[in-house]
C-alpha cells in the first residue's frame, strides 16, 4: 500500500553535478508547480560527497525522492533508457502522481500554468523522425537489442529528444511494459533514450490523446518559432525571459512552452538569477 503523498506531476531528473544548481532546480520546480514532486537519479560515478549532499536536499525538501538504483548517466552511455524506465516504474509502483514529466538537471520551469494544462492530454511527445544513418548509426547497428526490438516494426528506428515529454501513469505503464525487458543494461555508447523511447511511443501513440510536442525547448539557440518573430535575439532564453518578466504566461502557453533546457550549471548564471528574482525563490542549503 502506498504511503507517500500524491502529487499532480512528478519530474524525473537525472543528476550528476553541482549541488547548488540541483537545489536551484528544486526551488524552481516547487515555486512554479507547488503541487508537484521530483524524483532524482544519481549517477553511479558521482562522489560519495555528492551523494551525501543530495540526501541532505532530499531530507530537507519532503517532495524530493531518490531512485534507489544507480547507473552511469552520462548522455552517450546508453543507460538513460534504463534510468527513465526504472524511474517510471518507481512512480507507478508508488502511485505518486497523476503525471510524469521528463526533464534534466540543466532545465528550468518558466510557466506556472503547467499544473493545470497538463491534464488536457494523456501524453505530450514530439512526433519522432526515422533513423537510417548519420550520428551514432554505427553504434546502433552494434546494439542487437534494438535491432531485435524493431523487427516487428519493419526495422524502423525512430529518434527524437525526450526532455519535455510528459504522460499520465497509464501511458507510463505501457512504456514500462514495452521496454523493461529489452532496454540495454550495458554501455552501448549512444544516447539510447532518444531511440528506444521514441520507437516505443510510435507503437502506442494512437491508443491515447496525445499532443505532438515537447513542453520543453532549447534555451541556447533560436528555433523557427522565435526566429519567425524577427526580434534579433540570439537565444530563445532572451525572448522567453521578456515574456516571463512581463508575466505573459498565456503567450508561453500558446507556444506549448513550459520549461527550457541547456541552462548553464552555474548558480550565478544570469538567466537563473533573473528567474529567482522574478519568482522569489533562493537556495537555503547550498
Regions from the PLM with identified roles:
Residues 35-47, 67-70:
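Short beta-strand/loop segment that forms part of the nucleotide-sugar
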Residues 184-286:
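C-terminal catalytic/acceptor-binding lobe
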Residues 108-186, 190, 194:
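Conserved catalytic core of nucleotide-sugar-dependent glycosyltransferases
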Residues 77-85, 107, 190-198:
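Conserved glycosyltransferase catalytic-site signature
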Residues 27-36:
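Short, acidic, metal-binding catalytic loop of nucleotide-sugar glycosyltransferases
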Residues 50-97:
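Active-site-proximal specificity loops/subdomain of glycosyltransferases
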Amino acid at each position: 500500500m502506498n504511503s507517500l503523498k500524491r502529487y499532480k506531476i512528478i519530474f524525473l531528473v537525472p543528476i550528476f553535478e553541482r549541488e547548488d544548481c540541483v537545489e536551484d532546480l528544486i526551488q524552481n520546480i516547487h515555486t512554479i508547480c507547488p503541487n508537484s514532486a521530483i524524483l532524482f537519479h544519481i549517477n553511479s560515478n558521482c562522489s560519495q560527497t555528492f551523494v551525501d549532499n543530495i540526501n541532505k536536499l532530499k531530507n530537507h525538501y519532503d517532495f524530493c525522492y531518490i531512485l534507489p538504483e544507480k547507473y552511469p548517466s552520462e548522455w552517450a552511455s546508453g543507460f538513460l533508457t534504463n534510468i527513465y524506465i526504472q524511474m517510471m516504474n518507481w512512480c507507478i509502483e508508488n502511485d505518486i502522481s497523476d503525471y510524469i514529466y521528463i526533464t534534466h538537471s540543466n532545465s528550468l520551469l518558466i510557466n506556472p500554468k503547467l499544473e493545470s494544462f497538463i491534464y488536457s492530454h494523456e501524453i505530450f511527445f514530439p512526433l519522432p523522425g526515422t533513423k537510417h544513418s548519420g550520428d551514432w548509426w554505427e553504434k546502433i547497428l552494434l546494439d542487437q537489442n534494438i535491432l531485435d526490438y524493431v523487427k516487428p516494426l519493419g526495422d524502423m528506428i525512430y529518434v527524437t529528444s525526450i526532455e519535455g515529454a510528459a504522460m499520465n501513469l497509464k501511458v507510463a505503464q505501457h512504456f514500462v511494459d514495452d521496454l523493461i525487458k529489452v532496454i540495454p543494461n550495458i554501455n552501448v555508447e549512444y544516447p539510447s533514450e532518444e531511440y528506444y523511447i521514441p520507437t516505443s511511443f510510435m507503437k502506442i501513440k494512437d491508443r491515447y490523446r496525445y499532443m505532438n510536442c515537447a513542453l520543453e525547448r532549447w534555451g541556447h539557440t533560436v528555433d523557427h518559432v522565435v526566429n519567425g518573430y524577427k526580434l534579433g535575439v540570439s537565444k530563445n532564453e532572451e525572448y522567453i525571459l521578456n515574456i516571463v518578466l512581463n508575466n505573459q504566461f498565456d503567450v508561453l502557453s500558446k507556444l506549448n512552452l513550459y520549461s527550457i533546457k541547456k541552462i548553464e550549471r552555474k548558480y550565478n548564471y544570469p538567466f537563473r538569477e533573473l528567474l529567482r528574482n522574478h519568482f522569489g525563490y533562493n537556495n537555503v542549503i547550498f
